[in-house]
């Protein structure tokens, strides 16, 4: 197999003078060789096999070392010819490889060379070889000997043989010469020459030191015999540096690299494409550098599993820009891939310089993380109600608390599309809010009002849930009239950061009046969202108590003819459209005796007071209260002008209080009275669906989400006959949110119950700054309710009692009176504790009857037998004993077998169980499970257990099964009492042939009786005949 071409070697500087001396000697030797041509020709003829290695120029054999020792050429030939030469021919060819120079040199000293001696070539050559072999001169001086190129060409002309062929004649001649060597061939051995021969022997050392596997420098291709020499060379020349980072043009073109280094020799750009950190986008030259970077920075933990998105570095985006992006980012989960071009074109252009790898189609890893942070509210979103969360843990808590994961998984097809606030809806809202106030009793067109309310309230919910306050304020400004743009601009700025009322809001907006209303709407809607989130962090909001406890102002009225804002948890990213239903209703004053609205919480107070403060100035006009009620303000539509807001009267405050309380409670009969401010009574009491303000919606949402965790509290004035009606409504309308029905009833004094409604204590901030506190505050102070707690406490209580409240209760049979049923259940429990026939097998939770355990333990102890050495060994209970236990206790044979197998397994594995220790030592200790006393022998243990049981084990078989069946008949009597007579009659009508003795039920087949005994009474089917009788026999 031909070898690779290699470059000519570079000589070390230390050998230059020696080579010059040798070249001068070689010229003289050439002249002598030409004189004695016959000997040289014979020498050359026999030298073919070795000279072909020596004489091949750099183009033929490539590079050899500056030490052209004979062993190197021999081993080259050895490597190519698979070591065909023998040891003898190795030595002879080593000597011959000097190529005639040494031979002629020695002939000059030992013989007189005459031209006629050319015919005696065989004898002369034998003597010459013998002299050369015995002399160590060749091995000492010929180590660094190298022929010049001209001398090689001369030798080439003398060598007529083909260089690639193996010279069989030379091989045979060498072997014959080796056999005829004289004894003086080893007479003058040299230590150096013997070591050199030992190193050059391919038979002993293999190919480690041959020329084919010299230690080579990769940069200059110099070859060395030892690794130490190569190391010294690389340290001196600096060739040890890896040249992977250099371009191909800097490397020698003829240098061929092994195939395994192909990956590392890729272009730098290609390598950077592959060796790239997916998080920060840095490129690396080697896999080791990338690994070190990943381990140090822990970026391997942050590699996102997302498709590439436009590169936006998180370091470049300020919080203000992030807020802008939050406002402009897509709203629905269906369209999370929004356009970033408008808000972030400059950032993207600047960041293109940072991410040099963008031209390869890769994206900076930081953009993934920033994109996730930016769209986190879209990703961590409840699919049921649309609430957003900061962390996955918060979303999980919300799903668990509200039970939304059940609704999402069960109703994936209920996803709705997002409602967009179109310009038409904006116009409708404006026209609705600007309606003339003289028209209060006119019927509203249901279609217009429905669409208006739907669009506006949906938009409000969507915005508040998305927590995009800037966009919210923008929409508000579009919808609001020109009068309120300026006063509302200031107070709405703080609500970008705080969505609850603060002291500054009250101070800044005390003049306009609409700011408190708007801030309170933000408060309520955010509170609804937080309540739906399930895990609100109350400390995160500066003045949430203020938002819930506004009690210093007077209460505004709520007209009867407003709309119902029916809030349900939405299935997508927002609340459902809050469906309005308009009815024509007169302005009727409400009675205040309706105490059953006991769920009047602090939330109702804040809303009332805020609206009251806005409209307390002129309490005489009631005209605009119908169209500009809290429903309009809650929709974030245009708030009425100053003149309209000041028309709310104190008499309608009572209506408002009654309405809110009743709606918060649950659907209740509301009792309109005939008292208006002018004293005229309106007889039209048509049933209508009054407005539910955001606080009522909050209560209903909490009730719906938290599983009605709080029962309505009965206030002292709850003794009216309407309480039973309330309870009926409460039971019948669990599915319905808030649909109060107006029914005529008797009227009571408004002042009786108003004093119990509101409480003035624990007020965090004073909401009546720069306001007049005349009659309104005095009225509010008179309304107190000691049993009421803060809204936050109520919500916290709801969450606390959530697991108990959501646990399904067994439906009680309506046919059995409650008292009788309770007595039967108690009796049933007493009987079943006496004899546990209804077993609940719950794994490791022990539901064993202690009496059954004592019987089993006694039987097991009686089965132990004692050896002659006094040790006790295990034995098994026979089928007869098991049958006796099964008949007496009612346990199935399977249960008994499992208990015995478990006990024996524990004894074999650990040497003891609960009632038996040290069984592995042969001297057991028995423990009583009732009194924990210890016994050494089975007999004393059994007698002790019999004292607990009240009978002896040998008498257990004599005890009749009838005694047990009497007890079980007690149980069956209780259970059959709960069965409907129709099913019993139906069973009796069928062709029943078999009857269960234990419960008196009849069955058609024996198989049915066996199943019944096994499942109901835990009886083994093997002895079912004891408990079954034929109906015909009776």
Swiss-Prot record:
Q: How is it modified after translation?
A: Sumoylated.
Tell me where the cross-link Glycyl lysine isopeptide (Lys-Gly) (interchain with G-Cter in SUMO2) is found. 188, 306, 315, 417, 461, 480, 497, 601, 652, 800, 820, 966
Signal sequence annotation: none
Fetch the InterPro entries from UniProt.
HD (IPR001356), Teashirt_fam (IPR027008), Znf_C2H2_type (IPR013087)
- Residue ranges covered by zinc fingers (C2H2-type): 215-239, 275-299, 380-404, 926-948, 994-1017
Which coarse location class describes where this protein primarily resides? Answer: nucleus
Query: Which residues, renumbered to this chain, carry the PTM Phosphoserine?
Result: 980
Q: Which GO terms describe its biological process?
A: regulation of transcription by RNA polymerase II
Start-end of Acidic residues biased regions: 21-36
Presence of keyword Cell membrane: no
Ranges of Basic and acidic residues composition bias in the record = 459-482, 600-668
Keyword list (alphabetical) reads: Coiled coil, Developmental protein, DNA-binding, Homeobox, Isopeptide bond, Metal-binding, Nucleus, Phosphoprotein, Repeat, Repressor, Transcription, Transcription regulation, Ubl conjugation, Zinc, Zinc-finger
Chain's role: Probable transcriptional regulator involved in developmental processes. May act as a transcriptional repressor (Potential).
Q: What is this protein called?
A: Teashirt homolog 2
Source taxonomy: Eukaryota, Metazoa, Chordata, Craniata, Vertebrata
């Amino acid at each position: 197999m031909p070898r690779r071409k290699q470059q000519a070697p570079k000589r070390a500087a230390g050998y230059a003078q020696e080579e010059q001396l040798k070249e001068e000697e070689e010229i003289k030797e050439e002249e002598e060789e030409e004189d004695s041509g016959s000997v040289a020709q014979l020498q050359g003829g026999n030298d073919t096999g070795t000279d072909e290695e020596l004489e091949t120029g750099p183009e033929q054999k490539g590079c050899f070392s500056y030490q052209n020792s004979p062993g190197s050429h021999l081993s080259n030939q050895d490597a190519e010819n698979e070591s065909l030469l023998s040891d003898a021919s190795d030595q002879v060819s080593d000597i011959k490889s000097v190529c005639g120079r040494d031979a002629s040199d020695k002939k000059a000293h030992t013989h007189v060379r005459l031209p006629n001696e050319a015919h005696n070539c065989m004898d002369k050559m034998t003597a010459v070889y013998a002299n050369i072999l015995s002399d160590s001169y060749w091995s000492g001086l010929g180590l660094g000997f190298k022929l010049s190129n001209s001398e090689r060409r001369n030798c080439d002309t003398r060598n007529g043989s083909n260089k690639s062929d193996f010279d069989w004649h030379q091989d045979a001649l060498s072997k014959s010469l080796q056999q005829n060597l004289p004894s003086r061939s080893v007479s003058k051995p040299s230590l150096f020459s013997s070591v050199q021969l030992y190193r050059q022997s391919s038979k002993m050392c293999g190919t480690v030191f041959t020329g084919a596997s010299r230690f080579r420098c990769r940069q200059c291709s110099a070859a060395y015999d030892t690794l130490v020499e190569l190391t010294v060379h690389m340290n001196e020349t600096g060739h040890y540096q890896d040249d992977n980072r250099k371009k191909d043009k800097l490397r020698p073109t003829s240098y061929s690299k092994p195939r395994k280094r192909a990956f590392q020799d890729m272009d730098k750009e290609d390598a950077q494409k592959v060796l790239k950190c997916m998080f920060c986008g840095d490129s690396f030259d080697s896999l080791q550098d990338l690994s070190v970077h990943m381990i140090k920075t822990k970026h391997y933990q942050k590699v996102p599993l997302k498709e590439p998105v436009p590169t936006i570095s998180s370091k470049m985006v300020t919080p203000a820009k992030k807020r802008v992006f939050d406002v402009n980012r897509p709203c629905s989960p269906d369209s999370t891939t929004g356009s970033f071009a408008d808000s972030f074109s400059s950032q993207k252009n600047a960041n293109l310089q940072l991410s040099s790898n963008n031209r390869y189609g890769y994206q900076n890893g930081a953009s993934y993380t920033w994109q996730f942070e930016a769209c986190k509210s879209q990703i961590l979103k409840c699919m049921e109600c649309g609430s957003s969360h900061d962390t996955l843990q918060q979303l999980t808590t919300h799903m668990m608390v509200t039970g939304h994961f059940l609704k999402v998984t069960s109703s994936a097809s209920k996803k709705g599309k997002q409602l967009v606030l179109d310009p038409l809806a904006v116009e409708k809202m404006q026209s609705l809010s600007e309606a003339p106030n003289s028209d209060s009793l006119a019927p509203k067109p249901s279609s217009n009002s429905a669409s208006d309310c739907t669009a506006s309230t949906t938009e409000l919910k969507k915005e508040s849930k998305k927590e995009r306050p800037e966009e919210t304020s923008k929409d508000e400004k579009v919808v609001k009239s020109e009068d309120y743009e300026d006063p509302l601009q200031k107070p709405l700025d703080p609500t970008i950061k705080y969505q609850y009322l603060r002291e500054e809001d009250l101070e800044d907006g005390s003049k306009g009046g609409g700011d408190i209303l708007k801030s309170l709407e933000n408060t309520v809607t955010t509170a609804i969202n937080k309540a739906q989130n399930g895990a609100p962090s109350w400390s995160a909001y500066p003045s949430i108590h203020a938002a819930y406890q506004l009690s210093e102002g007077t209460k505004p009225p709520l007209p009867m003819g407003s709309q119902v804002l029916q809030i349900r948890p939405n299935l997508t990213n927002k609340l459902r459209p809050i469906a309005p239903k308009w009815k024509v209703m007169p302005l009727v004053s409400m009675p205040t005796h309706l105490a059953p609205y006991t769920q009047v919480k602090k939330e109702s107070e804040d809303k009332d007071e805020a609206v009251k403060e806005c409209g307390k100035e002129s309490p005489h006009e009631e005209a605009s209260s119908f169209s500009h009620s809290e429903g309009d303000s809650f929709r974030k539509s245009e708030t009425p002008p100053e003149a309209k807001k000041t028309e709310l009267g104190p008499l309608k405050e009572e209506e408002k209080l009654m309405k809110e309380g009743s709606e918060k409670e649950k659907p209740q009969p509301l009792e309109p009275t005939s008292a208006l401010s002018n004293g005229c009574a309106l007889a039209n009491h048509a049933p209508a669906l009054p407005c539910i303000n955001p606080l009522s919606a909050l209560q209903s949402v909490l009730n719906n989400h938290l599983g009605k965790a709080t029962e309505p509290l009965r206030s002292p004035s709850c003794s009216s006959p309407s309480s039973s009606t309330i309870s009926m409504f409460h039971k019948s309308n669990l599915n319905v949110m808030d649909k109060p029905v107006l029914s005529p009833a008797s009227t009571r004094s408004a002042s009786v119950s108003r004093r119990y409604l509101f409480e003035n204590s624990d007020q965090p901030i004073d909401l009546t700054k720069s306001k007049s506190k005349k009659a309104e505050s005095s009225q509010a102070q008179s309304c107190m309710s000691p049993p009421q707690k803060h809204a936050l406490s109520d919500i916290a209580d709801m969450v606390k009692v959530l697991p108990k409240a959501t646990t399904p209760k067994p439906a009680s049979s309506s046919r059995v009176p409650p008292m009788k049923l309770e007595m039967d259940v108690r009796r049933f429990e007493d009987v079943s504790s006496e004899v546990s026939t209804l077993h609940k097998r719950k794994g490791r939770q022990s539901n064993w009857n202690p009496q059954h355990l004592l019987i089993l333990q006694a039987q097991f102890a009686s089965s132990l037998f004692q050896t002659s050495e006094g040790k006790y060994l295990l034995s098994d209970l026979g089928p007869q004993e098991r049958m006796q236990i099964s008949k007496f206790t009612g346990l199935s044979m399977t249960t008994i077998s499992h208990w015995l197998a478990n006990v024996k397994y524990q004894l074999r594995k650990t040497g003891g169980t609960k009632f038996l220790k040290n069984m592995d030592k042969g001297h057991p200790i028995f423990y009583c499970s009732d009194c924990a006393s210890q016994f050494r022998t089975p007999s004393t243990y059994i007698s002790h257990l019999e004292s607990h049981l009240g009978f002896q084990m040998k008498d257990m078989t004599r005890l009749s099964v009838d005694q047990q069946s009497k007890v079980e008949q007690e149980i069956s009597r209780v259970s059959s009492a709960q069965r409907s007579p129709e099913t019993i009659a139906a069973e009796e009508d069928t062709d029943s042939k078999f009857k269960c003795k234990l419960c008196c039920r009849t069955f058609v087949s024996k198989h049915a009786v066996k199943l019944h005994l096994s499942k109901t009474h835990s009886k083994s089917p093997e002895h079912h005949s004891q408990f079954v009788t034929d109906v015909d026999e009776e």
